[in-house]
Amino acid sequence: MGTPWRKRKGIAGPGLPHLSCALVLQPRAQVGTMSPAIALAFLPLVVTLLVRYRHYFRLLVRTVLLRSLRDCLSGLRIEERAFSYVLTHALPGDPGHILTTLDHWSSCCEYLSHMGPVKGQILMRLVEEKAPACVLELGTYCGYSTLLIARALPPGGRLLTVERDPRTAAVAEKLIRLAGFDEHMVELIVGSSEDVIPCLRTQYQLSRADLVLLAHRPRCYLRDLQLLEAHALLPAGATVLADHVLFPGAPRFLQYAKSCGRYRCRLHHTGLPDFPAIKDGIAQLTYAGPG
């Protein structure tokens, strides 16, 4: 006859030792008690990161989370809300007062991600020093830096500004005209910089840009600089200014400018508007010529 089966409380079988339910469930109970301990072990690291990068977290909240929420609730973009504020608080025909109003709105209401007063002073000083006959701005955004350049242009100076987004360009156009600058002095072109640069000479009668401001997407800076070179739009001695070269950063652009041998480079260190602890800067390049 075969080996008899023995039935016991738990797990039983032929020749198997008795295993109680408590013993079987014991590892599951141990795993459950270890999770809080692991979480507590990571708590100091999380706190350290939050403290160290608190400025970046605040920036993320203001530029992404709160902005997206207000976009959904209002049905308007941040540039459109900013322009509505300017209409009710700024003096028409006074570009300085309009700029101050935008700064106040960005600091006290919604963060605008604009150039801000510190970088703005650097930009205006350089435009006044260089006295360019023609300026090309790539990245109009809300028109803040456009007003800065237009204020500092010499008599008879001309500014062409390029914005790829039609809705943003419409806001910038209204702001520029509200400040008192007409189309002969400030011309806004709607289109991507990649498409507009090859057409500047033929369609917009721009044979040379004495000063260029790159203020759109940092990852496009190198491409657009090389396009300007390829179409011979930079005369010897031309100044190229590039915003946001440290944050979010344009490393390939800076590496090219420093290594190609055609530019003298200088970096103006600043912080972000309302976030001075987040380091940024404006690159100033002086073009020596193609040779």
Curated annotation (Swiss-Prot):
GO BP term, example: dopamine metabolic process
Residues passing through the membrane, by range: 31-51
Positions contributing to S-adenosyl-L-methionine binding: 137, 139-140, 145, 163, 193
Source organism superkingdom: Eukaryota
Alphabetical keyword list: Catecholamine metabolism, Cytoplasm, Deafness, Endoplasmic reticulum, Hearing, Membrane, Methyltransferase, Neurotransmitter degradation, S-adenosyl-L-methionine, Transferase, Transmembrane, Transmembrane helix
Chemical reaction(s) catalysed: a catechol + S-adenosyl-L-methionine = a guaiacol + S-adenosyl-L-homocysteine + H(+)
Record GO terms (molecular function): catechol O-methyltransferase activity
EC number assigned by the record: 2.1.1.6
GO CC entries: apical part of cell; cytoplasm; endoplasmic reticulum; membrane
Misc note: LRRC51 and TOMT were originally considered as alternative reading frames, LRTOMT1 and LRTOMT2 of the same LRTOMT gene in primates.
Record's function text: Catalyzes the O-methylation, and thereby the inactivation, of catecholamine neurotransmitters and catechol hormones. Required for auditory function. Component of the cochlear hair cell's mechanotransduction (MET) machinery. Involved in the assembly of the asymmetric tip-link MET complex. Required for transportation of TMC1 and TMC2 proteins into the mechanically sensitive stereocilia of the hair cells. The function in MET is independent of the enzymatic activity.
Subunit structure: Interacts with LHFPL5, PCDH15, TMC1, TMC2 and TMIE. Interacts directly with TMC1. The interaction of TOMT with TMC1 and TMC2 is required for the transportation of TMC1/2 into the stereocilia of hair cells.
Family per record: Belongs to the class I-like SAM-binding methyltransferase superfamily. Cation-dependent O-methyltransferase family.
Protein name: Transmembrane O-methyltransferase
Organism this protein belongs to: Pan troglodytes
